[in-house]
Regions:
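N-terminal secretory signal peptides and thylakoid transit peptides that target proteins
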Residues: 1-19
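Early extracytoplasmic/lumenal segment of secretory-pathway proteins
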Residues: 27-92
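A structural signal for short loop-to-beta-strand junctions that line the ligand-binding cleft
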Residues: 77-79, 97-135
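Ligand-binding pocket segment of bilobal, Venus flytrap-like solute-binding proteins
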Residues: 84-90, 165-237
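Ligand-binding "clamshell"
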Residues: 91-101, 118-124, 222-234
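A bilobed periplasmic-binding-protein/Venus flytrap-type ligand-binding module shared by bacterial periplasmic
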Residues: 135-143, 241-257, 272-274, 282-283
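Flexible hinge/capping segments at coil-to-helix
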Residues: 144-160
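Extracellular/periplasmic juxtamembrane helices and adjacent flexible linkers that interface
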Residues: 255, 263-333
């Protein structure tokens, strides 16, 4: 009798244990959703605003891996975050449409214009997350004899000859030159270059290796706050815009996480994001009347005046032939 009783108890005990193990296995085997992107190229608040079902996987050494973003699409990826300069590297066939209808309806004119410039193949497969203006960063500006200090023309000051670190993007530099009236001769802007180095532009200026650099505001904010030798200029002619965007791989069955948007750009994060040099893809005109806790000197740079913001522009995607012509014009200058 005791033997039978023990047998029944053991059976029940092991049966319950087996059930618990099965349930535990199911819970732990559920794979987290994968967000991939380059660290520090987008606001970290974006990761924090996603649910705990998501995990961030950094993309490393993208400069030396030409197809890193496409490689990510072949891995387990549910969402991809990238800068607009990399969009053309993505195959449209590998992306699915991002509807997010209610959010798209609230996008600003700048965001809508940016998407239109991507063309029909991309505009519904790319979603703008944040935007940051390209600015001029100076080191010891007050000690430099600069001309036209509110304009891109300041780049042509003799004190900056061979002293500016430019982004390695002829397209962006040509767009600035054309804003100043240059058509096909870009030798003047080339003569001012110390280097064409996106990745190390900030280090060049901070270390004293260059007097100025052209870079996105979001990439130099921390140093600007800490280092009193640094200052920035948002030219009155406006500036190119650096967009941080999202893409959703076709192979992912996960719906686009629309709920994160209000959390990301809600009251908790808004001022923090702006102080990091990012602006929302929706209208921010009401923010000009609010205190965002930045120095008075930089208030109109972190939240540009409408007269300047209306002159800012995004770079549309170029066809293969247009890229070829642009390269020829740049190289022949």
């Amino acid at each position: 009798m005791n033997t039978n009783e023990l047998g029944r108890r053991d059976f029940i005990k092991y049966g319950l244990l087996s059930s618990l193990l099965v349930l535990y296995g199911c819970s732990t085997s559920k794979q987290k959703l994968a967000l991939r992107g380059i660290p520090e190229s987008f606001p970290t608040e974006f990761i924090n605003s996603l649910s705990t079902d998501w995990e961030f996987f950094p993309i490393r050494d993208i400069e030396s891996k030409r197809n890193s973003y496409n490689s990510s699409l072949e891995e387990k990826t549910d969402l991809l975050v990238l800068n607009d300069g990399w969009i053309s590297n993505l195959s449209t066939g590998s992306l699915k449409e991002i509807k997010a209808t209610s959010i798209r309806a609230d996008l600003s004119k700048k965001a809508t214009s940016f998407l239109d410039g991507l063309g029909e193949d991309y505009k519904n497969r790319i979603f703008p997350l944040a935007v940051s203006p390209w600015v001029i960063l100076f080191r010891n500006e007050d000690s430099l004899p600069l001309r036209n200090k509110n304009s891109w023309e300041v780049l042509f000051s003799s004190a900056l000859t061979n002293q500016i670190v430019f982004p390695n993007s002829p397209y962006l530099l040509i767009s600035i030159a054309q804003k100043l009236g240059f058509v096909n001769d870009f030798s003047t802007i080339k003569n001012q270059a110390k280097a064409f180095d996106d990745r190390n532009a900030l280090n060049w200026v901070v270390s004293g290796g260059a007097n100025a650099a052209v870079l996105p505001l979001s990439s130099c904010v921390d140093s600007l706050i800490k280092d009193p030798r640094l200052s920035i200029l948002l030219p009155q002619e406006g500036c190119p815009l650096n967009w941080t965007v999202l893409a959703s791989p076709r192979l992912s069955s996960e719906p686009f996480p629309t709920d994160w948007f209000e959390m990301l750009w809600g009251a908790t994060n808004l001022r923090r994001l702006i102080r990091k040099g990012f602006l929302p893809p929706t209208s921010f005109s009401e923010l000009r009347r609010k205190n965002i806790n930045v120095s008075k000197r930089n208030q109109s740079i972190f939240i540009p005046d409408e007269s300047v913001w209306s002159n800012c522009w995004s770079l549309p995607l170029l066809s293969f032939e247009a890229k070829k012509d642009l390269a020829v014009n740049w190289n022949n200058s």
